């Protein structure tokens, strides 16, 4: 994947990010290129070695086909999940870390439904908020709209599916 300054990409754990610059740094006498990513949510800048960008999960924003798949995932029936809180939390954490937008959508769907049915622990509420933030950021970019509209779209899809 070729990265250019000004491209918008998705970075796992943080969501949408803008490539602000491509820097060359010398580490242990070796010149390496780094992508300087400005995360859309919050005031965070991340530097990722260009060689490892795909390995750590930096990818393009989903297109219309990918968006349709995300909506299918959000509408899909509830998946079987571990009843043990710590196992469920760990499984969801792994899905978020994968950087796969469909796995993030699964986390949002499952935690949202669990919240509607039984409520969530404080840790799972934070995880749901983080997963929603990542998904809303990507939906906003894919739909070419703002976060508020993307959040409305997400809420409508979730409500219609339940």
UniProtKB/Swiss-Prot annotation:
SMART domains: CarD_TRCF. Induction: Induced by DNA damage and starvation. Controls rRNA transcription by binding to the RNA polymerase (RNAP). Required for the stringent response to starvation, oxidative and genotoxic stresses as well as control of rRNA under normal growth conditions. This is RNA polymerase-binding transcription factor CarD. PANTHER family: RNA POLYMERASE-BINDING TRANSCRIPTION FACTOR CARD, TRANSCRIPTION FACTOR YDEB-RELATED. The gene is carD. GO terms for biological process: rRNA transcription. Interacts directly with the N-terminus of the RNA polymerase subunit beta (RpoB). InterPro entries: CarD-like/TRCF_RID, CarD-like/TRCF_RID_sf, CarD-like_C, CarD-like_regulator, CarD_C. Pfam families: CarD_C, CarD_TRCF_RID. Belongs to the CarD family. Disruption phenotype: Essential for growth, it cannot be disrupted. It comes from the Bacteria.
């Amino acid at each position: 994947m070729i990265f250019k300054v000004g491209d918008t990409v998705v970075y796992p754990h943080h969501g949408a990010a803008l490539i602000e610059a491509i820097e060359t740094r010398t580490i242990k006498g070796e010149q390496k290129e780094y992508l300087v990513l400005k995360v859309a949510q919050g005031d965070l800048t991340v530097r990722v070695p260009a060689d490892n960008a795909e390995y750590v999960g930096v990818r393009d924003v989903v297109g219309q086909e990918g968006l349709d798949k995300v909506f299918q995932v959000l509408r899909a029936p509830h998946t079987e999940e571990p009843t043990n809180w710590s196992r469920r939390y760990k499984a969801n954490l792994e899905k978020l870390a994968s950087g796969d937008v469909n796995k993030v959508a699964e986390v949002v769907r499952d935690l949202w439904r669990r919240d509607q049915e039984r409520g969530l622990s404080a840790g799972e509420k934070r995880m749901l908020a983080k997963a929603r933030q990542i998904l809303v950021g990507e939906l906003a970019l894919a739909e070419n709209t703002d976060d508020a509209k993307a959040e409305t779209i997400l809420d409508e899809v979730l409500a219609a599916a339940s």
